[in-house]
Structures are given as C-alpha cells and as structure tokens.
Swiss-Prot record:
Every ABC transporter domain range: 339-572
Native organism: Escherichia coli (strain K12)
NCBIfam families: CydC (TIGR02868), PRK11160.1 (NF008364)
Protein name, UniProt field: Glutathione/L-cysteine transport system ATP-binding/permease protein CydC
Compartment(s): Cell inner membrane
Cytoplasmic side: 1-15, 58-136, 183-249, 298-573
Higher taxonomy: Bacteria, Pseudomonadati, Pseudomonadota, Gammaproteobacteria, Enterobacterales
Miscellaneous field: Overexpression of CydDC confers resistance to exogenous cysteine toxicity.
Length: 573
C-alpha cells in the first residue's frame, strides 16, 4: 500500500473535482436506493389501501417522490460520470507529465537497463492502470460507506432494530469482502502487470526485428514465444474474471440472505406495530437496493494488486537519482566557445574497462577538429561527455574556462548543436521534424536548408506538410543523416558536435555536405567524429584515438609526415 502514497499525493491538485465526483456518486446511489425503496413501498401501500377500501390515501406525494428519485438518479449518474472521468483524465495528465519529467534527467544512464518496450509499457500502460485507484477503489469505497450510514440512520426512524441489523450486515460485508478479494486477486494482478509488460516488450522486439528474423529464419521461433506469453496473459485475465464472478456471486448471496432476514424480522412488526403493512416492503426493497451499492467494492479491491504493481514499476523509474544534475542558476550563452579537457577519465557503469583514459585537449574558439579512430575507441563517448549525457569520474571539462557543470541545462543546450550517430525520426510532418531544432524558423528558411543539404525531394509531394515516420514516408540512412545536419544548421549554436555526419552518403554528396558544413560553420567551434578520411585536410587539427586514448594529434600534413596511425589509415585507402 505504501507504493500508492506518492500518487495519492498527486490527487490533492484536483481534490475539489474528485470530491465532487464522489459526492455525485453518493447522490446517485442514494437516489437509486430511494427509487426502489419508495417504489416498492408505494405499490404495496397502494395495494393495501385498495384492499382496505381506503379513499384518503395520498397517491400524489409518493408518485412525485418516485419521479424525483428517478430524475435525480439519471442526472446524478450523468454528471457523476462526466465529473469523475474529467477529474481522472486530469490526474492522468498530471501523472504522465510528472513521470516523464522524472524520466528525462535519467537518460541515458538510468534508462540504459530498460528495453524500449518495457519503458513504453511503464510510461503508458502502468500509468493508465493508476486511474483504477480513484474510479474503482476510492470512489466506490467512500460511496458505499456513506450510503450504509445514511440508510441505517434513515431506517432507524422507522425501526431501530431492523435498521441496525441491515446496517451491521452491510458494514460487516464492507469490512470483510474487499480485504478478502484483495488477497485473493493480489498475485493475479501482479502477474497480469508483469505479463502485460513482457508481452509488449516481446511484441516491440518482434516488430522492430522483422527483417533480421526473416533473413535468419527465426521469425517463427520468436512468434511462438510471443504466443506463449499471450496465452499466459489470457489465462491470468481468465483467473481475474473468475474472481470477479465469484465476488459478485457472494455479494448476491449475502444480499439475498439479508432480504430474507429483513422479510422475516419485519413480518413480526415494524416500529412497535404488530401489523407492518406496506413497511415490510420498504425494508425488503431497501435491503435489495442497498446491496447493489456494495457490488462494485469487492471487484474494485480485486484490481488493487494490479494497481499497486503498476505503482511499484513506475516508482522504480521515478525514484532513481539522475547521474547528471544541472544547477538552477541562470547562465549567459556565449557567442564563441573554446573547449578544454584535462585528464578526463570515464568508465561505463557495470564495466571494468575504461572508455576514456586521461583525455586532455585544447580547442580554441572557431577551431575545427576531426576525431578519427576505429569503432569502440571512445570517440562517441567523448562527445557524450561534452553534452553531459555522462559526467567523467575524473578530470574536468571547461567551456570558455568555466566548468561545463556550471551551466544550467537550457544554456548548455543552446550552446551545443549535435548531429547524433543515431538519428530519431519523429512520426510528424517534415516541418515539425525541423522546428524542434529552431521553433521560430520560417517555412522559407526550412525549405532553403533542406535544399542545401540535398533533401529537396522531400518537398515535392506535400512540401513541409509531408508526413514522415510511421504512417508516412520512411527515410533512408543517408536521408536521416542529412535531416540531422539540417537540424544542426538550424539550431545555430556556437559549438557543433558531429558524430559520423556523412555516414551512409555517397562520395559526391559527402563532399557537398562537408563543403556546406565548412561554409556555414566557419565561425563556430566544431568537433567531428568520423571513420572516413575524405575532406580531413580542411580541419585545423586531427586527433587519432585508440583504446580510449589520444595517440596522435596534429594537422593533416604533420600527421602524414610522422607516418604513424593516421598515415597508415591513408595508405590503406
């Protein structure tokens, strides 16, 4: 239960709407009970009056009460659903924002151990499951308790013994049934949450890996694993449905026994009258209607195990401490940036081998640096240190002679423009995919930058309104690289980090892109990670890395004259 406390605290923000929903639920329940109780008494009293030949029976007042209760029940149910669901959606919106805001600082270190499907399931499905806490647990429980009190007190004016007998049965049922079915459904609910996450994780992996699975003939094997998980998931759902049916059956049985007990006790007299008359129907129908108000409570607590399991899974993410933190102080963004690295050392979590070993580097403002080396030598890790995806365990990084850790996050993001190794294409329009780098850019500026990076073909159909990603046009690897370069050019930051910007491009396009970068980034500080040797002669410095260390550094001509590793790379062309 403790896992729910942080999320119950979030409900305070919408306490008035949530409270109004509970009040409307109580009014609806009381109107429903009043309708059946008054109708039963009215019909019975009318029959008794007819048999007795009474002509003074007031038909108008009870009839008006029946109509009033019916209208109140209908209107109350409508507005209760409207208010409760609106409040629930607001709480879910707040919860999603809260969860996502907690996730952002964790990337990439805190999220590296989770698969994409698992993260998606926790952020979407587990958050959605928490709406059961209000709709299926809190509201029915509070409503049932208030209804029991009102019914007991109301009936006590007619007969104290009958009222408190019925109230005691309902109160005992309310205290015993929910904990009983919570325990019965706890393991099933936890299993459902686990299997749902496992299924979505496997489904995501199966869909994303279709090409490789088909090529290597492993698609059927993975499909079988997916089907087995689905069967287990359906079996858990079946067990939960059986528990729901059992709880409803027990509630019907208790309700029926309570009705029989009321009928037997009321037959001996009501309120001191040996002849109960139509009042016997009033107590019987009140008992029948009151137990309908208790019906949702047992089923609700059966789902509580699933709600708690989802809360634990979300808290497992949100309670993590970020590896990298930013100060809250305001920092001015510089127009030009120099860069200094002093004895930077870094090791990835749960790995023994150092990714960076004593990196020391001085980059002057406006200088262009190329970083060369084989795969896994630490080039991309070095760029990640500059974006503060990770912080070094030893050494320091300075921007304009100030520690990079002294910049707040907004200032750092404005200072650095990045072309990442893995470019993400959002399922959105071409315009939206570019505006994330420069929200204030005009359509003319976006179209011009696309033409300059060789993506003018994307403008042929629907122009900037062309839909990209899922449900739209897919981009090739080379097109994705050029889109990332377009974003970097639009961002217009003084420090530019390029991670394999020409990977996947043909020689002609590569030369055009390198010329474009040299032209548009002439006054900027540039660090480019690459495997390719084309165009490196235009860089002021070339750094060769191996095994997390800088092994060579100098100009193109100097490195060729030394006939070291860079020379060997050139000779291997």
């Amino acid at each position: 239960m403790r896992a729910l406390l942080p999320y119950l605290a979030l409900y305070k923000r919408h306490k008035w709407m949530l409270s109004l929903g509970i009040v409307l639920a109580i009014v609806t329940l009381l109107a429903s009970i009043g309708l059946l109780t008054l109708s039963g008494w009215f019909l019975s009293a009318s029959a008794v009056a007819g048999v007795a030949g009474l002509y003074s029976f007031n038909y108008m007042l009870p009839a008006a009460g029946v109509r009033g209760a019916a209208i109140t029940r209908t209107a109350g149910r409508y507005f209760e659903r409207l208010v409760s669901h609106d409040a629930t959606f607001r709480v879910l919106q707040h919860l999603r924002i809260y969860t996502f805001s907690k996730l952002l600082p964790l990337s990439p270190a805190g999220l590296a151990r989770y698969r994409q499907g698992e993260l998606l399931n926790r952020v979407v499905a587990d958050v959605d499951t928490l709406d059961h806490l209000y709709l299926r647990v809190i509201s029915p429980l509070v409503g049932a308790f208030v209804v029991i009190m009102v019914v007991t007190i109301g009936l006590s004016f007619l007969d104290f013994t009958l009222a408190f007998t019925l109230g005691g049965i309902m109160l005992l049922t309310l205290f015993l049934m929910p904990p009983l079915f919570y325990r019965a459904g706890k393991s099933t609910g936890q299993n459902l949450t686990h299997l749902r996450g496992q299924y979505r994780q496997q489904l995501t992996a199966w869909l994303q890996g279709q090409a490789e699975l088909t090529i290597f003939g492993a698609s059927d094997r993975y499909r079988t694993q997916l089907e087995n998980t689905e069967i287990q998931w359906l079996e858990a759902q079946r067990r939960q449905s059986e528990l729901t049916a059992l709880s409803q059956a027990i509630m019907l049985l208790i309700g029926a026994l309570a009705v029989i007990l009321m009928l037997w006790m009321a037959s001996g007299g009501v309120g001191g009258n040996a002849q109960p008359g139509a009042l016997i129907a009033l107590f019987v129908f009140c008992a029948l209607a009151a137990f309908e108000a208790l019906a949702p409570v047992t089923g609700a607590f059966q789902h509580l195990g699933q709600v708690i399991a989802s809360a634990v899974r979300i808290s497992d993410l949100t309670d993590q401490k970020p590896e990298v933190t930013f100060p809250d102080t305001q920092t001015r963004v510089a127009d030009r940036v120099s860069l200094t690295l002093r004895d930077v050392q870094f090791t990835y979590p749960e790995q023994s081998q150092q990714a960076l070993k004593g990196i020391s580097l001085q980059v002057n403002a406006g200088e262009h640096i190329a970083i060369l080396g084989r795969t896994g030598c630490g080039k991309s890790t070095l760029l990640q240190q500059l974006t503060r995806a990770w912080d070094p365990q030893q050494g320091e990084i300075l921007l304009n002679d100030s520690p990079i850790a002294s910049l707040n996050e907004a200032a750092l993001r404005q200072t650095i423009s990045v072309v990442p190794q893995r470019v993400h294409l959002f399922s959105a329009t071409l315009r939206d995919n570019l505006l994330l780098a420069s929200p204030g850019s005009s359509d003319e500026a976006l179209s011009e930058i696309l033409r300059r990076v060789g993506l003018e073909k994307l403008l042929e159909d629907a122009g900037l309104n062309s839909w990209l990603g899922e449900g739209g046009r897919q981009l090739s690897g080379g097109e994705l690289r050029r889109l990332a370069i377009a974003r970097a050019l639009l961002h217009d930051a003084p420090l530019v980090l390029l991670d394999e910007p020409t990977e996947g491009l043909d020689a002609t396009t590569e030369s055009q892109i390198l010329e474009l970068l040299a032209e548009m980034m002439r006054e900027k500080t540039v660090l480019m990670v690459t495997h390719r040797l084309r165009g490196l002669s235009r860089f002021q410095q070339i750094i060769v890395m191996d095994n997390g260390q800088i092994i060579e550094q100098g100009t193109h001509a100097e490195l060729l004259a030394r006939q070291g590793r860079y020379y060997q790379f050139k000779q291997g062309l």
